[in-house]
Amino acid sequence: HYKKAILIGHDWGAPICWNTAALKTKFISAVVGLSVPYTRRGKISSTELWQKLYKKRFFYQNYFQKHYIPERELEKDLYKTISKVYYWCSAEGFINRIKTTSELDSGLLDGIPMPKGKLKWLKESDILKSVLEFKKSGFKGALNRYRAQNLDWKQLKVLDNLNIIQPSIFIAGEY
């Protein structure tokens, strides 16, 4: 049983760590956020903001708000999904300016090509492990994290008046 913790979070884990540190100062002694900086709670929820900003073109977080449609797309061919998403998120994908399609009614994977050959930084066994895990769990749990943003925004009004007071650091990379 521990009395204090240091939190480290990447991507979705970063805002969860930042907010936990702000809410639980007695228990969190330091916090590290990777890729996503600390931001205060906005006047509108992030999903409402995304819907306004991306009214006429595709944005993955808006797409993930739909129920069942993203799950069907992502779970149709797990190997293809995992390969495309890892490539899309890689430095090579970024350098090649891989983007999802900008058509409003498209799916996430529509604008992402399959990588040409094997990814240099990822073993085939790692892709297959991810395929097996998502075959068991599906994508609903991961997508529900995106769908919970409005609920978080409504229930965490207390964050309006809180700051990160612990030692903290934000780390980002170029690619």
Describe the residue ranges of each PLM region.
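Flexible "cap/lid" subdomain of the alpha/beta-hydrolase fold that forms the substrate-access gate
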Residues: 1-8, 12-175
